[in-house]
């Protein structure tokens, strides 16, 4: 279920404070955060966030298209290594029908 419009978007206060400080000083340093749940606000555009994915920090450069999404959407937590080639090879040669 989506968040109520009257509540507005959620962004951690410490994160918005860091962005405001960076905007005041015209600094474009990487902002490290564990807050995957924070919504990307228009003030965040042009900044790079290091978003924690459970193991390491993934750099996320925010563009205008990302506004309204969550920071965690751009830092995947699971790695897909592909299906085993052994199963593919066994399933591929299907018997020919006559």
Swiss-Prot record:
Record function comment: Protein S19 forms a complex with S13 that binds strongly to the 16S ribosomal RNA.
Q: Name one GO cellular component term.
A: small ribosomal subunit
What gene, per UniProt, encodes this protein? rpsS
Look up and give the organism this protein is from.
Answer: Anaeromyxobacter sp. (strain K)
According to the entry, what is the taxonomic lineage of the organism? Bacteria, Pseudomonadati, Myxococcota, Myxococcia, Myxococcales
Q: Which Gene3D superfamilies match?
A: 30s Ribosomal Protein S19, Chain A (3.30.860.10)
UniProt keyword terms in alphabetical order: Ribonucleoprotein, Ribosomal protein, RNA-binding, rRNA-binding
- Family classification: Belongs to the universal ribosomal protein uS19 family.
Q: Where is the composition biased (Basic and acidic residues)?
A: 9-24
* UniProt protein name: Small ribosomal subunit protein uS19
Q: Does the keyword Ribonucleoprotein apply?
A: yes
Alphabetically, the GO molecular function entries are: rRNA binding; structural constituent of ribosome
Q: Where is this region: Disordered?
A: 1-30, 78-98
Top-level taxon of origin: Bacteria
Q: Which HAMAP family does the record associate with it?
A: Ribosomal_uS19 (MF_00531)
InterPro entries xref list: Ribosomal_uS19, Ribosomal_uS19_bac-type, Ribosomal_uS19_CS, Ribosomal_uS19_SF
One BP annotation, GO: ribosomal small subunit assembly
């Amino acid at each position: 279920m989506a968040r109520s419009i009257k509540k507005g978007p959620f962004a951690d206060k410490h994160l918005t404070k860091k962005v405001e400080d960076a905007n005041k000083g015209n600094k474009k340093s990487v902002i490290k955060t564990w807050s995957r749940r924070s919504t990307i606000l228009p003030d965040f555009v042009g900044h790079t966030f290091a978003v924690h994915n459970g193991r390491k920090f993934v750099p996320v450069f925010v563009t205008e298209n990302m506004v309204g999404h969550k920071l965690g959407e751009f830092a995947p937590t699971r790695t897909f290594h592909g299906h085993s080639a052994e199963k593919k090879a066994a399933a591929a040669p299907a018997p020919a029908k006559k």
